[in-house]
Amino acid sequence: MAKVLEENDLRLVADVLVIGGGPAGTWAALTAATKGSKVVLVDKGYCGTSGATAPSGTGVWYVKPEEKLREEARASRYLLGGKLAEIPWMNRVLDQTYENMNKLGSLGYPFPKDDIGDPYKRGLQGPEYMKLMRKLVQKAGVKILDHSPVLELLADENGVGGATGVRTQSGETWTVRAGAVVIATGGCAFLSKALGTNVLTGDGYLLAAEAGADFSGMEFSNAYAICPTFSSVTKTAYYRYASFYYEDGSIVEGAGSQRGRSIIARNLLQGRQVYASLDQAPEEIRPLLRVNQTNFFLPFDRLGIDPFKDKFPVTLRLEGTVRGTGGIRIVDEQCSTIVPGLYAAGDAATRELICGGFTGGGSHNAAWAMSSGSFAGEGAAKFAKDLGDKADNRTLKSVSTTTFTKSGSGQILSKTGEAIQAVQEEVTPYDRNLFRTQKGLEGSITRLDGLWNDLRERVTTLDIAGVRHREAAAMTATARLMYNTARERTETRGMHKREDFPEIDAAQGYRLISGGLDKVWTQKAEVNKEAVTP
């Protein structure tokens, strides 16, 4: 792998460039490297510690290859997802997840033992998992650039061929030329302060849109997670053991973690605080819950609260597309986009294929991350290999919508902060994003269009100010895709809720494809018709 320093710039050449160092990105890099590709992985943070998985424990959609178990797994969230998942994709992801989880065990992941002494592989501890993935990626010969966010993709008439960015700790810029690029930048939580999501600002969506990629299921993007008002840990699965109370101790009827979050939201909208207690958790599993998600309990311990006995105030924290299902549309089994040389994996890609319009938690997302990462890494490696010597003669240019300069950071950061706040004011309130209406969506779209136009006209810098500007632009672009597709889906399906169309409409059992930057477009697409028996 060539490395040349020119004018304080880092320049690298690779077969495959992976953008993002979470589970999807590391699996993509590892897979491409094992196929013989020279791989560079760039991470906005530190690969192995940044992102939503690294600080958390997560369930995994790990199911043994027994038909009855697989049938139950396919049906588990099919109805919740609005019947938009597809059997072939569910089967592929179940197979790949089974293979990858077993591989992790053989490579040193310390799976706990179940009651009969077998490794328990339906969950992963984020810190151990991502520490191992970084180690495996490095051992495979992948070059990792930490603290190196991407600012622009590079492309020519034949497709994407690299990217440029900045190393935020040193201030130097970097360029990677590559035969193929995998976007594994995660979803967008709009800087809501949910644990691990500070780097998840929709950057990959903006990069993909600028390159000409399209999106699917962006209406399924309004995930809100239950969490204590004093914590950033959004471990929604634990609230299956919760009872919800008003301040006077009476029960909040219908409130729950899977189907009852709307009831919590409506009370919070009315200024009525809701409290929770994990008092339904059986005594014998409480120690196990603590072991599985230690950081969930730390805020309680600091405040002297026993969450299994005491009542504590809760809120709903926006997780957007991180726990949503919409994302970059993929067009084949290798997770290719419609742009040659560009692949998408993990939360950056649509997850409708395996769970429709509702994930319900980490297990499907974790399975999708490792599986789609593997698929994309293999596809990108093959694309780069087929490109061969042609890669050396490409005249690549930036496809960014942003103009960069070398001075003016202070003023830029100030204006960027205002833009980020403006986006958050459109996507965070429950009565705009969770409970959607035609009038509300159109008002938000008008304001977001104006914000996008304003950001398009601004000049920014090749430094941290430029990174923040691109985050603001990415969040704005993401919100516009979300709300334009939400306006077109005039029904309630999956996590998408329309107050003015509260029922599911059988005639709308299709996907909504979207794209565009200055003008967002939407169109309908059929779902694979093979039905799942719930």
What do these predicted regions represent?
Residues 1-16, 34:
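Extreme N-terminal leader/targeting segments of oxidoreductases
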Residues 11-14, 170-180, 338-339:
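Core beta-strand elements of the Rossmann-like FAD/NAD(P) dinucleotide-binding domain
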Residues 34-55:
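Glycine-rich FAD pyrophosphate-binding loop
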Residues 383-465:
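Long, amphipathic alpha-helical stalk/connector segments used for oligomerization, subunit docking
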